[in-house]
Amino acid sequence: MSDFQIIFEYCRCSKVRIPARAQVSEAILLAEGQKSAVTEYYLNNGEWPENNTSAGVASASDIKGKYVESVTVANGVVTAKMKPSGVNKEIQGKKLSLWAKRENGSVKWFCGQPVTRNDAKDDTVTAAAGNGGKNNAIDTKHLPSTCRDTSSAE
């Protein structure tokens, strides 16, 4: 086998096996891109934005990437959903959320398991419900250590 063939085989194989964690990093980056708009809305209005439009960001289906299907803002919670195909099987259709809570006149952001906030005027979040009682959360083994918060995070 020539050097070229070895390099070609290596590239061909490695392209197929992009680790789930690398794919999840795209979701985190896209979700984090919405944080400043959500924070600004809260600081100006005293409540969390109800949706992407009120936050002043693109529609959920327009915030997407190679592995991410959509990024939704709902009552200040930013949730990224992975695509149902073309991604690592362990994260297909799974979600992660970023959310903030008020802290001394500012906001503190959290990242981790998917959550929901029922009231835009409240900081309380709960674990998101999903199919069959599962919340479609990305397994923590695929999340960086800085993005493993749960709804009870303080």
Regions found by a protein language model. Give the residues of each.
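Amphipathic alpha-helical segments typified by the pilin-like N-terminal helix
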Residues: 1-39
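Periplasmic/extracellular, small/polar-rich flexible segments of pilin-like filament-forming proteins
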Residues: 43-154
